[in-house]
Every structure is written in structure tokens, then in C-alpha cells.
């Protein structure tokens, strides 16, 4: 009698969906509120000079921290409940809705979510005209053999945009156009994420003049605005080279063997779409579409740099672009476009953004569980912030500088706004640095590196999730690639921060 052994199929561990990860983080965050008491800082106004103008910012008073107590003198806790009603603090089951509807039109979550839907719809119209697909085919035909040059050219331009004017959300719009180009060139949509949004964040983090990060942090820390630019420019060059080389190596591997791409299946959308595209002569209508598209991009950059336009204005600019291009498409019958297909294209483009928009709202809800992240608000976050600051105070100055970098990187998971994080952390860490011998310029370096580079992998980064959404890249597929690049940049950041402290950078 022979024994028959049945082989059981091996179960491979699969990375949980991003929503599952966020919900698990929400549970851990809720549990923390049961053991960590609520703390509070008083807020104060600080002034700093930018381009000859006096700016003000609401920040915490580092000497005012206190644990809130009840009438019996015992520490007060804002323990997250399972479910709450009315204007009570959100419970665990409330955090998705509260996160999705929080904020204003100027930021996370509702402002960013509406921004994503509007630009998704606007570019849905642009792509429906067929001009972009037709232009990509023509571009490839005229640059055959030199395709690899697109990657360094785009990467450097986007990194420069992040360094000079804090480019971030704007990269989403460019990614919509560049994604089909990269796939057509034999790369993948992860390459698009790298050359657009990730490049902007490398520039953002290593900038010498970013108005939303380094300028605000220097102003709050009492360091002359735009000082220390020499080292920062060198760091920007090094960081950009690291990111560019990483991207070139990754893109080359994917081009040689497309099956190595983690998004080979999801990129089928772009490949199938391209298979249906037939090369046709460029018409006058196509040229009008490209002229309007280029003009709006210039208009957006001008508005951000000159007038400090932000989410509401940029979204309205892209809506204007979509409307005008849609009218051109209807008038010139581009790709058989009608008024009805113009409307359905807007809806389809917006629909593509729903999944990443949900992630943005859910991530914001996590912050609401521990406090709103605003200077002067009572929250668990303040207690954690003060405790970590006290722990750093007992370290050697070079080690303390490195721990400031690490702390800023972790803290950025909860407060992804560069200026918001500066308002919460710099008033504490700048004077703390004085006590342990860390130069304030180094403290600012630790802040900008920790704040900027960690945007590469945090699902709480609205712009990252939006870029992944338009490129149809699942966060789980992005995480391994992004974490590897972040590791390289964190090593560089650590060397720079410790080296700057030891060399007396100021």
C-alpha cells in the first residue's frame, strides 16, 4: 500500500492593502491616547524677514508646556472611544469621515481631495482629445535612440522646482502626462513617480530657498533667512545625483526586462490604451491644445512664485485649462469629441482620483485622533513632542543633531505640512539645540531633511498618494522602491547633519 502525500499550496505573505495599514495605525494611535496624557503649549507670534517683507507665524512657546489636569489634580486623558457623536472628539469609527471632511480649501484634507478630483477631471478631458497620445508617438519617432535623456532632463527640472518654489502638488498634473510617455518608452509608471513627485521632494528637502520649508524654519529658529546656502546647494546637487542615479538604474533594469517591474500588470492600462492609438497628422486643433497646456503650466508656475497662489487657485487654473481644451476638442472634433464626451471624460478623470483621495482623508483622520497638530492646541501629540525633546537634551551634540533628524522624519508622518511642522517643532528644538551645543543652522538642516525626504514613503503625504493614483501605482508596490531610495537619502542626510555639526556649520 503506497502512501499518497498531498502537497498543500504554500501561502505567500502579501502586503496588506494601504487602507488596512492606515486602519491598523489608527488602532495603535487610539491605544496610545489611553496611556499618554494630554499636554499643551501656549502659542506665540514670531516675525521673520523674507524678500524685505515681514512675515508672522503662530508657533508654540517652548517654555510653556504643561500636562493638563482635572479638578482632582490628576493628568487628563483624551482617550479615543470606539464611537462618538456631535462635536465630541472623533472616535475610532469616526476617524475616516472626520478626516475626509476636515480642514479647509487651503489644505488637507478637504482642500487636497477637491484639488485631486478637479485636476483629475481636467486632465481627463485633455487626454480624451488624443493630442497627448498623438504627441507622444511623434516625440518618440523624432527622438529615437535618445529616449534615455528624458529621465535626467525631467528629474533635474522637477528637483529644481522643488528647491526653488516648493513644488509638490503641481507634480501630480505633470505625472498624468508623463506616465503614458514613460510606458511607451519601455519604462514603467514607477519611473514616472520618480522623475516627477520624488524629484520635487528631493529638491524640497535639500533646498536653500524653499519658501514653505527652509525659509519658515530659519525664521522661527531666529537664523538669518537664506543663510547657509552654500552647503545646502552642494547637498541639493548630491541628493539630486543620488536620486537621478537610482532612477536611471531602476529604469534601465525595467527597460531590459519589463517583467521585473512591480507594476507590469497595472501598466497594462497604458499599454492597451497606446495600442488603440493611431498616428494621425497634427491638426491646428492639436497645436491649440498644446499651446493652451503649455500656457497654463507657465501660468501656474508664475502664480505660485509671484503671487503665492495655492490649492484653490491652482485647481481653478487647471479647471480653466480643461474647459478651454475641451471646447477646442469639440470645435475641431479631436478624437471625435463632443460636449457629452467632454463631460464624461471629466467624470472619468475624477473617478481615477477617488482611491488616493480616500487615503488622504483617512490619513488626516489619524492626526485628529491625537490632536489637530496646531500650535496652542491641547493634544497627546504635544506630550510626545515634549518628551522626545527632553530625551534629546541629555545627548552629545553630534548625536543630538542626528536624533533631531530622526525625530523630524518620524514626526512628519503625523504633520506632513512643512510650515506646520516647523511651527510645532522648531520653537522647541532650536533652543534645545542651544543647550546641548547644536548650532541652530544644523537644527534647521535636520528639520528640512527629516520633513522632506520622508514624504517619499508616507501614505499620509497627500501629494504622494495623488501621484501614485494618477500613475495607477499601488502603494504596496511603491513602498519597496521608495524605501530603498529613502534609505540612501537618509544615510546621506545623517552624514551631512553630523558632519555639519562637527565642522561648526552656521
UniProtKB/Swiss-Prot annotation:
Keywords: Antiport, Cell inner membrane, Cell membrane, Membrane, Transmembrane, Transmembrane helix, Transport. It comes from the Bacteria. Its main location: membrane. It is a multi-pass membrane protein. InterPro entries: C4_dicarb_anaerob_car-like, DASS-Related_Transporters. One of its GO terms (molecular function) is antiporter activity. It is found in: Cell inner membrane. One of its GO terms (cellular component) is plasma membrane. The keyword Transmembrane applies. The chain crosses the membrane at residues 19-39, 107-127, 148-168, 171-191, 208-228, 231-251, 287-307, 310-330, 352-372, 398-418, 419-439, 442-462, 485-505. The keyword Transport applies. Metabolomic profiling of different yfcC over-expression and deletion strains suggests that it may affect the glyoxylate shunt. To H.influenzae HI_0594. To B.subtilis YcgA. NCBIfam families: PRK11588.1. This is Putative basic amino acid antiporter YfcC. It comes from Escherichia coli (strain K12).
